[in-house]
Amino acid sequence: MHGLLLAAGLLSLPLRALGHPNPNPQMHTLSRRGAVDLDAFRLGQNAEYSNTASVASNPPALSIRSTQSYVDVAKDLVKTTLPDATFRVVNDHYVGTNGVAHVHLRQTVHGIDVDNADFNVNVKDGKVFSFGNSFYKGKIPEENPMVKRDHADPVKALKGVVSALKLPVKTEKASAAISAQSQGQDAVVFKGTSGALSDPKGELVYLIKPDGELSLTWKVETDVGDNWLLSYIDAKDGKNIHGVVDYVADATYQVYPWGINDPTEGEREVFTDPWDGNASEFTWISDGRTRYPTTRGNNGIAQDNPSGGNQYENNYRPMSDDLRFEYPYSTDMSPPDSYIDASITQLFYTANVYHDLLYILGFTERAGNFEYNNNNQGGRGNDYVILNSQDGSGTNNANFATPPDGQPGRMRMYTWTTSRPNRDGSFEAGIVIHEYTHGLSNRLCGGPSNSRCLNALESGGMGEGWGDFMATAIRLKAGDTRETDYTMGEWAANQQGGIRQHPYSTNLQTNPLVYTTVNQYREVHDIGTVWASMLYEVLWNLIDKHGKNDGPKPELRDGVPTDGKYLTMKLVIDGMALQPCNPNFVQARDAILDADEALTGGENKCEIWAGFAKRELGTGARYDRSRRTGSTDVPQECQ
């Protein structure tokens, strides 16, 4: 068998902070949106989280044990906590690599899902470890809408969504047909429309509105490219929008790599068969059934997409019967399509390396990762990542769409027009890492079948922050110390100092962001910078304690990374799976502490607390929708 040869780059010089950044506000905007601000329709944050410490002092939770299964433990906890609630078990439960089982349950009313009412239970050693809850606790409607049937028909709901959100979808000839794929009682697919990338869908669900009231809604799904929306429109009047979820996550920056941060910092090299045999058992160029002489395999399929459309299978991608994917590229080449082979190869390489690393750190088939053939390892297959290089639907940006497990993720990488010649985001591995991390966090938070759990303002901000953090952690070099600062977006944006307000730094003068800073922000990338700054503090505390592995993947001892860098990444990933749907900063902090308790027995508790407390997320920190309270306190045993 011929070895796969991928042209890629190795970093030779770290990128340092270059004084005070000068953010470009245009790059902090969302990518489409037209005249409608979708942020105004974000769902509220109403989740509660009981961490492992609070469970230890909760007699009802402690008393629940089962000799049957961890699913029974979860069901019994819900019945004990909310005895009058009706619910169903979501079919995406699994046991993580840290030994913690994750079960997700959805509240129902009259057999209809309450779409944002979730209960997640984490079970370890047959006992409740921690849990999150956003179930509706108010008065349940007495009348069953399926009997009375006084709600608007689904076509009216679709037209109401298109009109209210100004979507580019034509609905004059729309009709609704019963959907055979959904579990919902009233689930339809809309035929006869145009303008969407696939047929819109509709389903009758309840929704907890921002004011806390329960409302019957039509959930209308529309994929219009830059936005893949779930819109909740009032089922009675077919006019009022009560909430919107967007599967697409935007980025306004480019960042770091394993090999090269940007083309100015090193030379491309040739790698032979670079995959990890455990994470990618079929290699990168096979799905277990077919071996492809191109940039296609079990984890991803990479191609150009100059039209910006939804079709990809027949798009251009480089072919090589001898599997030598070596193509010329230099920053002087123009136009971008003159080096499209090199661009596609670089994107394919970076996405696959990250897939393999995340697999080692626990993002496996059971957890909802992105693979076409899951090889009987759990989860749902048929969902590699569609990787579009030089996508024609936009510029100066990138995005990632994360539908539920079993449907492909979609990454769109754009060219950047902020320099001459234009630059290609696929050569910035940090952009790819950030975007792919949206897929990671959306699949883990709330479970693989629920991609709606990072849609509130603060949780959406953390979604951006995790992308920044993972890319920064991967970017660390052998000579770096806690005094090393990193800026964001300098090469692609052609902007000295990057596109964030502050570089990532452990120096509070260089980066003064703290928890209460979030009170000033209403934009997810700004909020995400605060969250990533906190994680950067935790990262260096654990590196100082355990050292730093500068290799491309961690060394594990009993499933625990032996160094501080990969340990922090592992705890952050495990915390995503523990936390409730749409968490706030305090709950996500507690989930990371719980992740350390589950993985190491709490060995790093004080280092984690110190990192968060330095930036006001200490023991006394409190979340309130209108005002956050900061605290620099740590537990007494850590003082």
Swiss-Prot record:
Gene3D superfamilies: 3.10.170.10, Neutral Protease Domain 2. Disulfide bonds: none annotated. Residues 1-19 form the signal peptide. Its cofactor is Zn(2+). Residues 20-250 form a propeptide. Binds 1 zinc ion per subunit. GO terms for cellular component: extracellular region. Glycans are attached at N278. One of its GO terms (molecular function) is metalloendopeptidase activity. PROSITE patterns: ZINC_PROTEASE (PS00142). Residues 293-312 are annotated as: Disordered. Its EC number is 3.4.24.-. It is found in: Secreted. Zn(2+) binds at H434, H438. One of its GO terms (biological process) is proteolysis. The active site is at E435. It is an enzyme of class 3 (hydrolase). Keywords: Glycoprotein, Hydrolase, Metal-binding, Metalloprotease, Protease, Secreted, Signal, Virulence, Zinc, Zymogen. It comes from the Eukaryota. Secreted metalloproteinase that allows assimilation of proteinaceous substrates and probably acts as a virulence factor. Belongs to the peptidase M36 family. This is Extracellular metalloproteinase 9. It comes from Coccidioides posadasii (strain C735) (Valley fever fungus). The lineage of its organism: Eukaryota, Fungi, Dikarya, Ascomycota, Pezizomycotina.
